[in-house]
Amino acid sequence: MAKRIVEPFRIKMVEKIRVPSREEREAALKEAGYNPFLLPSSAVYIDLLTDSGTNAMSDHQWAAMITGDEAYAGSRNYYDLKDKAKELFNYDYIIPAHQGRGAENILFPVLLKYKQKEGKAKNPVFISNFHFDTTAAHVELNGCKAINIVTEKAFDSETYDDWKGDFDIKKLKENIAQHGADNIVAIVSTVTCNSAGGQPVSMSNLKEVYEIAKQHGIFVVMDSARFCENAYFIKARDPKYKNATIKEVIFDMYKYADALTMSAKKDPLLNIGGLVAIRDNEEIFTLARQRCVPMEGFVTYGGLAGRDMAAMVQGLEEGTEEEYLHYRIGQVKYLGDRLREAGIPIQYPTGGHAVFVDCKKLVPQIPGDQFPAQAVINALYLESGVRAVEIGSFLLGRDPATGEQKHADMEFMRLTIARRVYTNDHMDYIADALIGLKEKFATLKGLEFEYEPPVLRHFTARLKPIE
């Protein structure tokens, strides 16, 4: 039975929200081109679009912002952030960025240049358990191919497995052999694995991937947006880490990468911010700093105010607290359990930051190229004012080489839970709304494009229902 986890905080400030009328919702969705990304937030009651930058900051984070050192160069907060990164990850070098894609835009071109300087990467490739959308876009914008090799277990949404975010080791070895180690710019370990359902990657898998990479001289990057949630799952599910602290788990995780990119808008509990950290490769760090200046800003602020770096340092501390993570993961699980008990198919077990509803099973009459999850998302919004997001064919987009729609193994509606924002009563409202739609799913129809952007289309595309 679904179990509520009591929030480990009191609420000091509230923001009024309202349920727009059915007529308002219908007009807003039509105006948005049936793409919830284009809805104004005033037309949304509960916003499950993303957990990125939607966090509620703590009193200690707000207090830390008052201490912001806004020096253009050499801000005190930069050095505090450097010390915190050393404590958590044991990496020597950091570069702040305005968000995760800023961090990728600093590091990824440098890794390609570094590989090509050695006369390699003539047909450049990045391999990941699963690149998220913006990560794949940065890979492809640099003329590289993004290859995803998450475990096949991730595609069986009904069957429980502890580690549905793991790499498929057999496929990793096959891809290295097929493309050649010289062409592999980097392996990206995404923790947790968002596109597979926010699923964790095991410590043993991270270690094996890193060992294989080192055998072939391949650089490893940890995509670290949700590293605290991944560490919590390792502590909860790996007997070796049962008695470890979350920080001890994190310290071990980062032994198995050479660098990290991070959106601090997720687990570090910020509304803005990102980070590049490099273990010990001074040459790559120097090249990345050179790129930071024209792209993000001076190397000790990287597009952030000093106050934002101060809040990041505090957020990195709070995000590692086990009591908070127990509530955080538990709230997501509560929503997932309520849906599952009502017969709504989800990625099971629930992951760290969202419930992923399996829309291939929910609306089997809609083919992938008509975006089944998007149809369900729009139905949920019209029913309740709840905004969700698609993780499937719409997000994957087209193959840049052929222009053909990429095949999505899963068609998910992601119900993404902002950190410390919504109560368990909000979870019940979401569950009741979706369960109440069960009789209508068989009547839903797909969507087609009115406008399709060439890159990251799901952000700004306009759609229309297929009659």
UniProtKB/Swiss-Prot annotation:
One Gene Ontology molecular-function label: tryptophanase activity
UniProt keyword terms in alphabetical order: Lyase, Pyridoxal phosphate, Tryptophan catabolism
N6-(pyridoxal phosphate)lysine found at: 266
Entry's EC annotation: 4.1.99.1
Family: Belongs to the beta-eliminating lyase family.
Binding partners and assembly: Homotetramer.
Enzyme superclass (EC): lyase
Ranges annotated as spanning the membrane: none
Recorded metabolic or biological pathway in which this protein acts: Amino-acid degradation; L-tryptophan degradation via pyruvate pathway; indole and pyruvate from L-tryptophan: step 1/1
Listed cofactors: pyridoxal 5'-phosphate
Substrates-to-products reaction catalysed: L-tryptophan + H2O = indole + pyruvate + NH4(+)
UniProt cross-references to InterPro entries, sorted A to Z: ArAA_b-elim_lyase/Thr_aldolase, Beta-eliminating_lyase, PyrdxlP-dep_Trfase, PyrdxlP-dep_Trfase_major, PyrdxlP-dep_Trfase_small, TNase, Tryptophanase_CS
Protein's recorded name: Tryptophanase
